[in-house]
Design a protein with these regions (language model features):
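Feature for exported/extracytoplasmic and membrane-associated proteins, marking the mature portion
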Residues: 2-314, 318-326, 345, 365-436
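Low-complexity, Pro/Thr/Ser/Gly/Ala-rich linker/spacer regions in secreted
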Residues: 433-446
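Beta-strand segments within the central parallel beta-sheet cores of soluble alpha/beta enzyme folds
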Residues: 282, 330-337
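Short, glycine/acidic-enriched loop or turn micro-motifs at the edges of active sites
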Residues: 57, 292, 342, 460, ...
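Histidine-centered active-site microenvironments of extracellular/periplasmic hydrolases
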Residues: 338-369
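C-terminal outer-membrane/trafficking sorting elements
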Residues: 445-455, 459-533
Length: 533
């Protein structure tokens, strides 16, 4: 039996430590855990920490980040759930875009220069199943690929291929990644084994790691059992340092009550300040599958979704304030994500259905504050099939964090993503200059600078797309309203900057809206095109 199969078939994915902090069980992932390994290489260069906040269920990004500049189309598409324009909270330094009125905490972080929104994050040909879409986000695969390792886990496997032998050691005494809660994440799965294990009975866990079990037989299965016991012994050692770190912090800033996300983030702040060298923390918050009764009909600024967004906003604000109070905010950034967004058009049940691209938030004192991207394109008469077209591929968010926060060489970053992922990884302007090398990332394009156009528009069978490239690799994809990539018109390197044209032949395609997605370096734009009869 292979070690990987033995582990997967005999034990849950993560080992639950017999430690409880603030009422939450803490799961420590060892070095071979994907996300753990992605960050351990960074330990020789940086003491940076990443906090991943998973919003489970598929968050309605269009009601979270609201296109005020295109409010009439937004309202027409979802009048029964739309947020009144006068109630939308402005974002410091950003015009024409605001956030949900319940997110005053995040608005304060924008005002303090500690938050960034990235518009329309997704991937080509999205999947609308919760389980499959979550796997795609955690593994960084294509929608057509089955990848069984996590995006960060592959990096850690590259850094620490010999784990678990020799860990913990004098160079790294602490767990490399910690998930707060009771579930594990594919994000931390390595190519061969996920080093987190879940044991729900603390007594049996103690017996296993304290050596009170019978000797393992001299068989292949016995060797695997010895391996599991070795991991559990390491986990027990990690539980000691986690408890010591938690006990080292006796005072923290105030957190909101009745907020499970805030409870989790409070533990993270405590462990960071307490001295753990852990590089990645994972927390989760569910309830975002809002097919019905997303808002209160009498006041759309209230209701189920508003409550969720307020708790997320309040928790992140309290966490950031606590990091500042504890004197460690310069070491930590956070990232939110959900497995998909929602459709542009609301449904008759005062809710929204599974959709494609959606915004992400980054937060922390090292984040380049403001907004990356532009308001999503909303049709004048949106249908139930219309989705927000992708502007940024989520894998470019991951790769930028690995390169610019954990200071990994770009060529190594690229090697850690699955082959044929149908995207070119971009280095995006997410973080302030100097975090790793002092090299200032290229500024994002001025949204007013029109880079891609087409004529005629509307068109009957074909249209000519004109685009401006700065040289280098240039990509133009044709995407339908479901987010599927129908054609790739341009995928090549241009030796010099200039203006070029390419023909889009839509013969055989149904009439309706299509999007031309242009990507060149850090720049991308989406052009809506209408095919008529």
């Amino acid at each position: 039996m292979k070690r990987r199969d033995f582990l997967l078939n005999t034990l849950p994915a993560a080992a639950l430590l017999p430690e409880v902090i603030n009422g939450y069980s803490v799961k420590a992932f060892d070095t071979n855990s994907p996300l753990v390994q992605a960050l351990m290489r960074g330990t020789t260069l940086t003491d940076h920490v990443l906090v991943i906040v998973q919003l489970s269920g598929g968050n309605d990004g269009l009601n979270m980040v609201i296109p005020v500049a295109d409010y009439s189309r937004y309202f027409n598409a979802r009048s029964n759930v739309a947020i009144p324009e006068a109630r939308v909270l402005p974002i410091a330094g950003v015009s024409g875009t605001g956030i949900h009125p319940s997110m005053t905490g995040l608005q304060s972080l924008f005002n303090e220069g500690k938050a960034k929104v990235i518009q329309a994050v997704g991937y080509p040909t999205p999947n609308f199943s919760h389980f499959r879409a979550t796997d795609i986000w955690m593994s960084a695969s294509n929608s057509t690929q089955e990848v069984y390792s996590g995006w960060a886990g592959r990096y850690l496997n590259y850094e620490y291929p010999n784990f678990p032998n020799g860990y913990p050691n004098t160079d790294m005494t602490d767990p490399l990644a910690i998930q707060i809660g009771s579930t594990t994440s594919l994000t931390t799965q390595g190519p061969s084994v996920n080093m987190g294990m879940s044991i729900t009975n603390p007594t049996s866990f103690y017996n296993l790691v304290s050596g009170t079990t019978d000797p393992a037989p001299d068989t292949p299965a016995g060797k695997e059992l010895k391996f599991i016991r070795q991991v559990n012994q390491q986990t027990q050692k990690y539980s000691t340092v986690i408890r010591a770190a938690a006990n080292a912090v006796t005072q923290q800033a105030t957190y909101p009550t009745n907020n499970s996300l805030a409870d989790q983030l409070k533990i993270v702040a405590r462990l960071v300040k307490g001295g753990l060298k852990t590089r990645v923390y994972m927390v989760s918050f569910g309830g975002f599958d809002t097919h019905s009764v997303q808002v209160n009909a009498a006041d759309t600024t209230t209701g189920a979704h508003a409550t969720l967004l307020q708790r997320v906003s309040d928790a992140i604000k309290a966490f950031q304030d606590d990091l500042k109070f504890l004197g460690v905010e310069e070491r930590v950034i956070g990232m939110t994500y959900s497995e998909f967004g929602r459709r542009i058009k609301s449904n008759s049940s005062v809710g929204t259905d599974h959709g494609a691209a959606a915004p992400m938030f980054l937060f922390g004192s090292s984040v380049e504050a403001g907004m990356l991207g532009v308001n999503p394109t909303i049709p004048a008469n949106a249908s139930v099939n219309d989705n927000i077209p992708m502007q940024y591929d989520f894998r470019s968010i991951y790769s930028t964090i690995l390169e610019k926060w954990f200071c990994l060489d770009k060529t190594i970053v690229e090697s850690l993503f699955p082959p044929n992922i149908n995207t070119q990884l971009q280095t995006l302007p997410l973080l302030k200059a100097g975090v790793c090398s002092g090299v200032t990332p290229p500024p994002p394009p001025d949204p007013a600078d029109v880079i891609v156009t087409n004529y005629p528009n509307p068109f009957i069978t074909s249209t000519t797309i004109k685009f401006k490239t700065e040289g280098g690799h240039t990509l133009i994809q044709i995407i339908d309203t479901l987010g599927r990539v129908l054609k790739v018109l341009v995928d090549r390197d241009y030796p010099t900057a200039g203006i070029y044209t390419v023909n889009f032949d839509a013969e055989g395609l149904a009439h309706g809206i299509y999007y031309a997605r242009f990507q060149n370096g850090v720049t991308q734009q989406v052009r809506a095109m209408l095919k008529v009869r």
